[in-house]
């Protein structure tokens, strides 16, 4: 079984889309193994977006992720990463297919509702930013 980190970003929380996002992952057959609402620190956001550190939009990403509460969750299932990425849709919501979370709800490329780990390596780095091992259920 594979796991994937999902974040409902500040715009998703602010727009009351938490339940909708969670239910889409559950309907896809993915089990929730960890779930919490939290405020992201600047240090956590910088670590999460570290692959973008040298890009001009890095500071905007960090500011956005720390602008309000998020919901962090870990889902598990067969091909959890690929399934989660398909559910999320293209990063740019204007290019995301209808029926995907971003296609249905995204406001722009930054305020795009959700994050989903894009690889097993990303998941292994990312989940440790948001969860301690004792917060993850077997």
Swiss-Prot record:
<feature type="binding site">
    <location>
        <position position="112"/>
    </location>
    <ligand>
        <name>ATP</name>
    </ligand>
</feature>
<keyword id="KW-0547">Nucleotide-binding</keyword>
<keyword id="KW-0460">Magnesium</keyword>
<dbReference type="GO" id="GO:0004550">
    <property type="term" value="F:nucleoside diphosphate kinase activity"/>
</dbReference>
<dbReference type="GO" id="GO:0006241">
    <property type="term" value="P:CTP biosynthetic process"/>
</dbReference>
<dbReference type="Pfam" id="PF00334">
    <property type="entry name" value="NDK"/>
</dbReference>
<dbReference type="InterPro" id="IPR034907">
    <property type="entry name" value="NDK-like_dom"/>
</dbReference>
<dbReference type="GO" id="GO:0005737">
    <property type="term" value="C:cytoplasm"/>
</dbReference>
<comment type="similarity">
    <text>Belongs to the NDK family.</text>
</comment>
<protein>
    <recommendedName>
        <fullName>Nucleoside diphosphate kinase</fullName>
        <ecNumber>2.7.4.6</ecNumber>
    </recommendedName>
</protein>
<keyword id="KW-0597">Phosphoprotein</keyword>
<dbReference type="InterPro" id="IPR023005">
    <property type="entry name" value="Nucleoside_diP_kinase_AS"/>
</dbReference>
<feature type="binding site">
    <location>
        <position position="91"/>
    </location>
    <ligand>
        <name>ATP</name>
    </ligand>
</feature>
<dbReference type="InterPro" id="IPR036850">
    <property type="entry name" value="NDK-like_dom_sf"/>
</dbReference>
<feature type="binding site">
    <location>
        <position position="85"/>
    </location>
    <ligand>
        <name>ATP</name>
    </ligand>
</feature>
<dbReference type="InterPro" id="IPR001564">
    <property type="entry name" value="Nucleoside_diP_kinase"/>
</dbReference>
<dbReference type="GO" id="GO:0005524">
    <property type="term" value="F:ATP binding"/>
</dbReference>
<keyword id="KW-0479">Metal-binding</keyword>
<keyword id="KW-0546">Nucleotide metabolism</keyword>
<comment type="function">
    <text>Major role in the synthesis of nucleoside triphosphates other than ATP. The ATP gamma phosphate is transferred to the NDP beta phosphate via a ping-pong mechanism, using a phosphorylated active-site intermediate.</text>
</comment>
<feature type="binding site">
    <location>
        <position position="9"/>
    </location>
    <ligand>
        <name>ATP</name>
    </ligand>
</feature>
<dbReference type="GO" id="GO:0006228">
    <property type="term" value="P:UTP biosynthetic process"/>
</dbReference>
<dbReference type="GO" id="GO:0006183">
    <property type="term" value="P:GTP biosynthetic process"/>
</dbReference>
<keyword id="KW-0067">ATP-binding</keyword>
<keyword id="KW-0808">Transferase</keyword>
<dbReference type="GO" id="GO:0046872">
    <property type="term" value="F:metal ion binding"/>
</dbReference>
<keyword id="KW-0418">Kinase</keyword>
<keyword id="KW-0963">Cytoplasm</keyword>
<feature type="binding site">
    <location>
        <position position="102"/>
    </location>
    <ligand>
        <name>ATP</name>
    </ligand>
</feature>
<feature type="active site" description="Pros-phosphohistidine intermediate">
    <location>
        <position position="115"/>
    </location>
</feature>
<feature type="binding site">
    <location>
        <position position="57"/>
    </location>
    <ligand>
        <name>ATP</name>
    </ligand>
</feature>
